[in-house]
Amino acid sequence: MMLRLLSSLLLVAVASGYGPPSSRPSSRVVNGEDAVPYSWPWQVSLQYEKSGSFYHTCGGSLIAPDWVVTAGHCISSSRTYQVVLGEYDRAVKEGPEQVIPINSGDLFVHPLWNRSCVACGNDIALIKLSRSAQLGDAVQLASLPPAGDILPNETPCYITGWGRLYTNGPLPDKLQEALLPVVDYEHCSRWNWWGSSVKKTMVCAGGDIRSGCNGDSGGPLNCPTEDGGWQVHGVTSFVSAFGCNTRRKPTVFTRVSAFIDWIEETIASH
């Protein structure tokens, strides 16, 4: 699941931690490629129940042993969810997977999120797991940036997820990764880019031939730190309704550093 802004948007349905993945991504990513298994160990698959089976709908990031951050538009109070940690190839049971049910009362969507106004922002939600994750090589915590942190233009970040391989295409079995350089607010908010649809509580990345797509929603925008680690700076929110890789329409993410206080307060009170 990923949102699309109708006149030109499409929703993509992305704590202290370990930071660095076990293998750095390839610099040859263009439209996305298979990630190295378990190289993004905070990535989760959010799945919903239908007719007795569970289906992938969004990504997310494990930010505490019993908490996941995802997109607000990924959550519906009428659905039953589970989270799968330690997932890589969804078609194969590989061993590290941890399937954790979600109680209906443990879904916390940002109070200002408005499904009918994607461009208003606040597309973020927290999920409390019914039991704590068992951390290890395949399951680790994401690092989050300091409150208010803004990435410079062209910071080389990576989107990860099981979203569609191209507009209206299939969902992949294996976790995908793609290099998405940051597009700063000055550029992304220009009239012939996203214009006023982009707010300062968002971060843009990629555009042209690289982007997120349906199924990537809620998953992380992983950005490098000076010490060689990674921080989750974005939660995948929307792309263009004209297609997942429309020129001058970078993927738009909820900027995590704008919501650190809300994240901390929500976790502390539950």
Swiss-Prot record:
Any Pfam family the entry gives: Trypsin
EC number: 3.4.21.70
GO BP terms: proteolysis
Family annotation (InterPro entries): Peptidase_S1_Elastase_sf, Peptidase_S1_PA, Peptidase_S1_PA_chymotrypsin, Peptidase_S1A, Trypsin_dom, TRYPSIN_HIS, TRYPSIN_SER
Signal peptide positions on this chain: 1-15
Positions annotated as active site in the UniProt record: H73 (charge relay system), D123 (charge relay system), S217 (charge relay system)
GO cellular component, one term: extracellular space
Keywords on record: Disulfide bond, Glycoprotein, Hydrolase, Protease, Serine protease, Signal, Zymogen
Chemical reaction(s) catalysed: Preferential cleavage: Ala-|-Xaa. Does not hydrolyze elastin
Gene Ontology molecular function, alphabetical: peptidase activity; serine-type endopeptidase activity
Propeptide feature ranges: 16-28
Xref: CDD domains: Tryp_SPc
Disulfide bonds: C58-C74, C117-C120, C157-C223, C188-C204, C213-C244
Matching PROSITE patterns: TRYPSIN_DOM, TRYPSIN_HIS, TRYPSIN_SER
Coiled-coil segments: none
Top-level taxon in the UniProt lineage: Eukaryota
Domain annotation Peptidase S1: ranges: 29-268
Function, in words: Efficient protease with alanine specificity but only little elastolytic activity.
Family: Belongs to the peptidase S1 family. Elastase subfamily.
This protein's name: Chymotrypsin-like elastase family member 3B
Organism, as annotated: Homo sapiens (Human)
